[in-house]
Amino acid sequence: MSRADQLFVNMCKEILTNGFSSEGQTVRARWEDGTPAHTIKTFGVVNRYDLQEEFPALTLRPTAIKTAVDEMLWIWQRKSNNIKDLNGHIWDEWADENGSIGKAYGYQMGVKYKFAQGEMDQVDNVIWQLKNTPYSRRIMTNIYNFQDLSEMGLEPCAYSMTFNVTGDRLNAILNQRSQDVLAANNWNVVQYSVLVHMLAQVTGLKAGELVHVISDAHIYDRHVPVIEEMIKRPQYPAPKFRLNPAVKDFYDFTTADVIIEDYQKNPQILNIPIAI
């Protein structure tokens, strides 16, 4: 059975059984009909994924892996803040009339800073360090720029990555301030797992662990029945994953270089309402 499924089920059970409900509290998020979107939450969730053991895609329901990877590349590779550069409609609600989400996500990745080795952006700094000083304890990114928050369509949810090399393994910690568990949990796990694999390949390393730290892991009130049904579904082995081995430059990767095989999964859950 998929380890990712087991972690997801355990997390959801913990939230539903011991989580804190925001009912009666003032909340920002709203459903499309204007109703307050309340949640049940757990503070400080930590899930560990061994990327050598399996590729952590859920089998409880399908994850659109290529679409998730495209969003990750939109941020990390294309460093774009315009949804016209994205092959999906995930960000439509947060974009302005020109398609911009402001100074968020990809915009922050493209900002250049003066590092000891020269002027470059955060992504290039990570790649440079992994190639030249892989055992450094300072290999990280952070896109939660307080100065620019007022100009962001959405403040970053997944906001920092810390990379750590142990032997020949590239490990990473993904820090997330908030997560809609049903809509986004496996989406984020999949895309950052692929990122670790890609960075490992272009720097001569092997993918190790992805540790996902979520400050506020929550299930929305209208998602509770969906989650309760979903976690009772049968679980299947994780799909097989590989990257095109010919790619040696991070900026040459496309979604076509991500190969997923034997992905056995349950039916998709359609028309999931999203709180905004």
Annotate each predicted stretch with a short phrase.
Residues 1-276:
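Terminal, non-catalytic protein-protein interaction segments that mediate quaternary/complex assembly
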